[in-house]
């Protein structure tokens, strides 16, 4: 899922003379004050101050992904020979799990463990009421190889892989899929894409009968959200940058249709570059914190990564035919913190909007956060479009720190709201792709997380079946 990119860097005066002459600390402090500014761009931010509190906070078990018993973990029986990782359920407009002719439906990325380029969306289904990992049936690939050409879409024709997204059960009983069209032909170009998936039921079987209305929705405008052309123009993979435009999550609010997605900021709302290191809005905390942290960052080995870090959870409005209606400001950004905030997920619960994202410590620029740290971060607002404030004061919702070679390693945590109560079901995948001959990437055991206002906590002793979606 991780792609490299680069963009133009803002030019900022260096302090070579001051460093050679001594007094480096004073020179940095003076320069920081001269260059400092505060610009929020009208959006919420994942701040350095909040993130720096997380290494201590994550020691609390209420934020820790449960430990799982390796001996109980099974491969998905109906996915023989396949690794299965990122997954998402067919959901109703309010985010609860839909029932399709008596079944729960899950879409997931799957492919051969021996071929990293083999990444396609498969459809799995399970009778409502059955929770066993062995009860999941596999309807196969959603798209035929020819579908990207049959769509007569200039972007789709260059697709080489299918990446994560979401699916909604429409008011007229249709399955509408949203996913990421990835092209290895164009420096990792990613585009938000949709199709109607036609499914029929026969006896105890769901069958995919092809797709229709298969089309590209959005591939970045450059101004609000970075596009791949900017990445290409300014150095592509050689920069250490990370271009993202993926993981579209469908949501409705007050009769309007939206996609929330992973992205990077564009040129008009907080672009990457050295000057971003002087924006107080990205730091949080007070003046003293900004002065100390910005000076430290300027001299850090992570300075370059921080300059390039401009992750965003973006939002666009859709027309009723699922074409682009309006490009909107990001819901939240992670400038100077990380370039990658994945698996966008948002829903309304008890009158509040909850926004979640997954991220890796290895992509972050925060002292105390390690490369093995895996996070789900969360934010809350009174409206879909924000402003968003961090849950649990910092945004920490879940942390997992296992070695990637551990069979019980999990990632791509996804919160599934329930029809009743204050608990959500957390799903994930378990075991990294291609790491073991006999242990495939599979649905991880689900578990419960409680949400109450601006606080969350993992529910003790709440481990469920692998891939379980509901408890009501």
Curated annotation (Swiss-Prot):
Residues 1-29 form the signal peptide. It is found in: Secreted. GO terms for molecular function: levansucrase activity; metal ion binding. The record marks 247 as: Transition state stabilizer. Coiled coil: none annotated. This is Levansucrase. Catalyzes the synthesis of levan, a fructose polymer, by transferring the fructosyl moiety from sucrose to a growing acceptor molecule. Also displays sucrose hydrolase activity. It catalyses: [6)-beta-D-fructofuranosyl-(2->](n) alpha-D-glucopyranoside + sucrose = [6)-beta-D-fructofuranosyl-(2->](n+1) alpha-D-glucopyranoside + D-glucose. Ca(2+) binds at residues 241, 272, 308, 310, 339. Its EC number is 2.4.1.10. Ca(2+) may play an important structural role and promote stability of levansucrase. It comes from Bacillus amyloliquefaciens. Sucrose binds at residues 85-86, 164, 246-247, 340, 360. The active site is at residues 86, 342. The lineage of its organism: Bacteria, Bacillati, Bacillota, Bacilli, Bacillales. One of its GO terms (biological process) is carbohydrate utilization. InterPro entries: Glyco_hydro_68, Glyco_hydro_beta-prop_sf. Belongs to the glycosyl hydrolase 68 family. Gene3D superfamilies: Glycosyl hydrolase domain, family 43 (2.115.10.20).
